Amino acid sequence: MTIRYPNGHAYRAPAKKIGSQFSSTNTNYGKRGMTLEEELNESNTYYEVNGVAVVHKKPTPIRIVKVDYPKRSAAVIKEAYFSTASTTDYNGVYRGHYLDFDAKETRNTTSFPLQNFHQHQIDHMRACTTQGGICFAIIKFVTRQEIYLYRAQDLFTFWDAQQQGGRKSIPYATIAQDGIQIPAELQLPVPYLKAVDQLLS
């Protein structure tokens, strides 16, 4: 099936790397083959099953253009478009607070490129924070195997500076200093709600 962006360009999903099912005891993240999105989805399932929070990945709105019906009981989508630009990846409720956040990965070791975000995502997070929502980015430095919660307000500072000709990335050292590191736990690949607790305290 071909899925296209509103500008007509074909969507190509990033290749997934398959990690070894075995990990050494010194590794912080045992499930190395999992993407950040998969890790978050697993964590959110744990949170919901245990009555801790209700957080879901937002569906991406798609407009179907062409469908084939090889059998009466089966339809095959052959062509579709992203109908609108997506906002952030996840939203939900925790301890009476609205959460809205995006998940990003980078293989850079010294900085996080701001090009990973889009203006409509920043605008959406600004609107949510204005209404009292808790917005942030969960950033994974893949090579370092480190994950951080980075507040939207801090992200806005770098985004606005970039718009004025400033640097086009956030230094790793800044994220490590101002963000909240999220170490993996036995049952939770990304126990980010502990970091949210720090924002709420």
Curated annotation (Swiss-Prot):
The keyword Transmembrane helix does not apply. The record marks 104 as: Transition state stabilizer. GO terms for biological process: chromosome segregation; DNA recombination; DNA repair. The keyword DNA repair applies. Its EC number is 3.1.21.10. HAMAP family: RecU. Belongs to the RecU family. This is Holliday junction resolvase RecU.
